Amino acid sequence: MTGRGKGGKGLGKGGAKRHRKVLRDNIQGITKPAIRRLARRGGVKRISGLIYEETRGVLKVFLENVIRDAVTYTEHAKRKTVTAMDVVYALKRXXXTLYGFGG
């Protein structure tokens, strides 16, 4: 007996965290050089200084929509873990098909 009593959770099965760290200002993690690299990959030569904040805003809205759809697929399947296929289907729904992740 491990001394956990009835209904004790096994290893790695901890309950929900009581205090969750509030995530804010993480969009600044998309750095100026990262946006510049993406633009270079797209064939851009010179970039205006105002582009960086605008790109962060557009990316945030896009990811919010994709994540919302992926979580909807997960909840419909009565799962708690978002799979790669949920994200693929969410992207496909927003007409941006992604290859190489199954399906």
Swiss-Prot record:
GO cellular component: nucleosome; nucleus
Family (UniProt): Belongs to the histone H4 family.
InterPro entries, sorted: CENP-T/H4_C, Histone-fold, Histone_H4, Histone_H4_CS, TAF_TATA-bd_Histone-like_dom
Bias (Gly residues) ranges: 1-14
Residues with PTM N6-acetyllysine: 6, 9, 13, 17
Quaternary state and interactors: The nucleosome is a histone octamer containing two molecules each of H2A, H2B, H3 and H4 assembled in one H3-H4 heterotetramer and two H2A-H2B heterodimers. The octamer wraps approximately 147 bp of DNA.
Example GO biological process: defense response to bacterium
GO molecular function: DNA binding; protein heterodimerization activity; structural constituent of chromatin
Subcellular location as annotated: Nucleus; Chromosome
Superkingdom assignment: Eukaryota
Residues bearing PTM N6-acetyl-N6-methyllysine: 6, 13
Pfam families: CENP-T_C
Keywords for this protein: Acetylation, Antibiotic, Antimicrobial, Chromosome, DNA-binding, Methylation, Nucleosome core, Nucleus
Family matches, as PROSITE patterns: HISTONE_H4
Protein name: Histone H4
N-acetylthreonine carried by residues: 2
Modified residue annotations for N6-methyllysine: 32
